[in-house]
Amino acid sequence: MKEFDLPPDGAEELRALLEHSGAAFQREGNRFRLRFASRGCQWQTVCDCQGSLVLVYGIHSARVAQRERALELCSELNSRAVRGSFFLQEERIVFRTSAQLTERFEARERIAAALEYNAAVLSSQWERIAAGAQGLVLPRNPNTAGPA
């Protein structure tokens, strides 16, 4: 196979994207850690690269105090998420998206889209997730636009 026929390497494409954008990140093999900030919220994002697949995990900063309510909220948010899913991991609510890289010419675009969607969903649901982690219920605002 010629090099252009091979699927892109997710770790190398993500590294190039982050370096080009000027984002600060830490790399440990095929795992990348970076901080995101939007709408006054800050959180950690972890990307795991598995060949041509890049998994993006946005980790909400609130510790879960009420596990049952947090799981209910994850289920509720998952019913509306277009791409990706919410789950509970180590007392944190996490939103996972992914980018499957098939062509080199669009690899960085796909990774950027997965990162942007992850950040948009997490920031648009920030207050609901923080409340849900504490066992509280915030009503959904039907006028609030958001991916989830």
Set out the residue ranges of the language-model regions.
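Short, internal acidic amphipathic alpha-helical interface segments
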Residues: 55-96
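Charge-rich, low-complexity N-terminal segments
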Residues: 1-44, 87-88
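Generic alpha-helical secondary structure
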Residues: 7, 11, 67-70, 111
